[in-house]
């Protein structure tokens, strides 16, 4: 009998999974030149800065503030070795050190650092470190703190500094490069930016959008205004995804995008190293990013932050306009192209246009509102928490029937899996297994039997901060050709109906369906009015449905560019007026059209449409009509809490963080 001693057991090596966050963007600290407005320069950053200064951002608002003077900085030590700079890149800084803004917190932290050094020098065990131990160390270090709040703040600082679980960030992060004054050119660059942003009345734009936000609920708030879709020199329109995200006041996203500001965040980090409360959530989002984004043609970190701040400014102006009913874009306002050029390095495949747009908008402020627990594909007993911007639903990879459609509701919200090939969190109902590739050995998020799947709610793997977003992949040929906005290619859209719930209940909190972006495959207005002309399955564009206080409202910017759409829209306007006067019974609609008073109303509405203007009430839909369109054509679903109840459950610091 042969011996088995020579038999070698081959060890199976799996590829590294993408669940562990590794932040490194492979960029230089600062570029070869300083950026300033210059339309003749081939630099993308300079070109965008030039667009910001071409005309005033806003014509009224707060008065200009004096630029903050920079601190005098000691000369760098020329004897510093290369090893010191490498060591600095690997250093981590506790986020609490940056978000604390008051002097008493700064002094308190200095005392806490002294206590930490004392404990580390003596190799003390802090597992059972109490207030009594803290007071004893303070007495030895001659630190006098008697108030209860101060003592517990000190204890928190000490334990946070010595704990490996505290939230920290590497100094190689672009914001930390600015915070630590890593290069003399950074200060020179920020001085040039002050000359760029001040003439454009930048502070007025910030103050106005923040004031507008306090009084805004959804687009019905602006129902007394005339909505404009075209101007003489306008060349585009506000993208429907922007209307879906900012046409309704969404919790957490509003705090980061409207209350927060990327440019002032950079200034505060560099000048005073203290961040104001308005920028708390933006700062936390940015410093806890899993991976950076890269802008095409930009090769250094500081320039990337400047470009990000410029895009944030353009988005802010777009938000201001769309909430005033201004839906057209001029050349200096076109932000879509800049968003389409962002490279998301954590994605292993080219995104479809709508996913690219959604991911880019959210990545500008690092918005990831959902924290989901995902099982490690190679270690089933290892469950990790992963923050995500949105959850992906892929109908083409699921087997469905008329009696068993894809259902997004409170019972299926916890059915999630991680796709290692794309680095995305996938919606995976228990009765519709997600068919991944061989390299993506997906397993159930919480492996339980289908008969007891209701137990998922008890140990919820989904924690949501105000807003939850779904992205539905309906393109049937997404991996063949992409980039409709550049190539003119039209994808085939899968219009298989889905069961979409009006509300989700997550951890006892109700999240309502606030908005939906849908694929436009035909002239939907004429189709809804009874005509079957123009129906097909090819993508022509997008439209948005908002659920406002006055009912579902449709934003369809492409409807003004077709005669058939304009005629159908006029009919829709007249029907809404008829329903307003006579209820939902349309039996006498055509007799009503022949009345003299109706003809005058029709002429007024026709004149408005000829000038590409409408009233808010002209585009209202019935709830049944809206849900039918969403069921067949939705590509983005936005669920959120009502904003005021969201604030009521938060403390003053949690509102910003």
Swiss-Prot record:
Record bears the keyword Protease: no
Main location: virion
Entry-linked InterPro entries: P4B
Keyword line: Virion
Pfam family of the protein (one): Pox_P4B
Localization annotation: Virion
Family: Belongs to the poxviridae protein P4b family.
Gene Ontology cellular component list: virion component
Kinase among keywords: no
Job description of the protein: Major component of the virion core that undergoes proteolytic processing during the immature virion (IV) to mature virion (MV) transition. Essential for the formation of a structurally normal core.
Post-translational events: The precursor is cleaved to a mature protein during virion maturation. Proteolytic cleavage of major core proteins P4a (A10L), P4b (A3L), and VP8 (L4R), which occurs at a late stage of core formation, is required for production of infectious mature virions (MV).
Propeptide positions: 1-61
Name by which UniProt lists this protein: Major core protein 4b
